[in-house]
């Protein structure tokens, strides 16, 4: 049976962690000096006027490299807990992790052979 008093610490932590950022924003809004002027209403207020067009079109190659990086980065995040408990889990989990690693590697080899990672 669920006993709600078991979660008192969780609810207290949730309420306190919600109140602290709200109080920080309220206090900074009250104590911050009001600085109004034409510089504050411009879209670029560092004092240097931007030159040229702000819209730049990126090459699709950047997105391909970013996508490959994100895939392997997320895979690393999932493999870290497995590596920390490798001695406890056994061989079956090792085979599952090996398959988990091989699937993105097959995708990387496919992208490499199709020329998706070529820079020229």
Curated annotation (Swiss-Prot):
<keyword id="KW-1278">Translocase</keyword>
<dbReference type="InterPro" id="IPR023043">
    <property type="entry name" value="NAD(P)H_OxRDtase_bac/plastid"/>
</dbReference>
<dbReference type="GO" id="GO:0009535">
    <property type="term" value="C:chloroplast thylakoid membrane"/>
</dbReference>
<keyword id="KW-1133">Transmembrane helix</keyword>
<keyword id="KW-0793">Thylakoid</keyword>
<dbReference type="InterPro" id="IPR038430">
    <property type="entry name" value="NDAH_ubi_oxred_su3_sf"/>
</dbReference>
<dbReference type="Pfam" id="PF00507">
    <property type="entry name" value="Oxidored_q4"/>
</dbReference>
<comment type="similarity">
    <text>Belongs to the complex I subunit 3 family.</text>
</comment>
<feature type="transmembrane region" description="Helical">
    <location>
        <begin position="88"/>
        <end position="108"/>
    </location>
</feature>
<comment type="function">
    <text>NDH shuttles electrons from NAD(P)H:plastoquinone, via FMN and iron-sulfur (Fe-S) centers, to quinones in the photosynthetic chain and possibly in a chloroplast respiratory chain. The immediate electron acceptor for the enzyme in this species is believed to be plastoquinone. Couples the redox reaction to proton translocation, and thus conserves the redox energy in a proton gradient.</text>
</comment>
<keyword id="KW-0874">Quinone</keyword>
<feature type="transmembrane region" description="Helical">
    <location>
        <begin position="64"/>
        <end position="84"/>
    </location>
</feature>
<keyword id="KW-0150">Chloroplast</keyword>
<dbReference type="GO" id="GO:0008137">
    <property type="term" value="F:NADH dehydrogenase (ubiquinone) activity"/>
</dbReference>
<dbReference type="InterPro" id="IPR000440">
    <property type="entry name" value="NADH_UbQ/plastoQ_OxRdtase_su3"/>
</dbReference>
<keyword id="KW-0812">Transmembrane</keyword>
<keyword id="KW-0618">Plastoquinone</keyword>
<keyword id="KW-0521">NADP</keyword>
<keyword id="KW-0934">Plastid</keyword>
<dbReference type="GO" id="GO:0019684">
    <property type="term" value="P:photosynthesis, light reaction"/>
</dbReference>
<keyword id="KW-0472">Membrane</keyword>
<keyword id="KW-0813">Transport</keyword>
<feature type="transmembrane region" description="Helical">
    <location>
        <begin position="9"/>
        <end position="29"/>
    </location>
</feature>
<keyword id="KW-0520">NAD</keyword>
<dbReference type="GO" id="GO:0030964">
    <property type="term" value="C:NADH dehydrogenase complex"/>
</dbReference>
<protein>
    <recommendedName>
        <fullName>NAD(P)H-quinone oxidoreductase subunit 3, chloroplastic</fullName>
        <ecNumber>7.1.1.-</ecNumber>
    </recommendedName>
</protein>
<dbReference type="GO" id="GO:0048038">
    <property type="term" value="F:quinone binding"/>
</dbReference>
<comment type="subunit">
    <text>NDH is composed of at least 16 different subunits, 5 of which are encoded in the nucleus.</text>
</comment>
């Amino acid at each position: 049976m669920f006993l709600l008093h078991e979660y008192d610490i969780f609810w207290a932590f949730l309420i306190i962690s919600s109140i602290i950022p709200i109080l920080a924003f309220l206090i900074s809004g009250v104590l911050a000096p009001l600085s109004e002027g034409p510089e504050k209403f411009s879209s670029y207020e560092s004092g240097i006027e931007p030159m040229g067009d702000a819209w730049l079109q990126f090459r699709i190659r950047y997105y391909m490299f970013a996508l490959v990086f994100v895939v392997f980065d997320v895979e690393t995040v999932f493999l870290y807990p497995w590596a920390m408990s490798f001695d406890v889990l056994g061989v079956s989990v090792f085979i599952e992790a090996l398959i988990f690693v091989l699937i993105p590697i097959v995708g990387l080899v496919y992208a490499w052979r199709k020329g998706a990672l070529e820079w020229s």
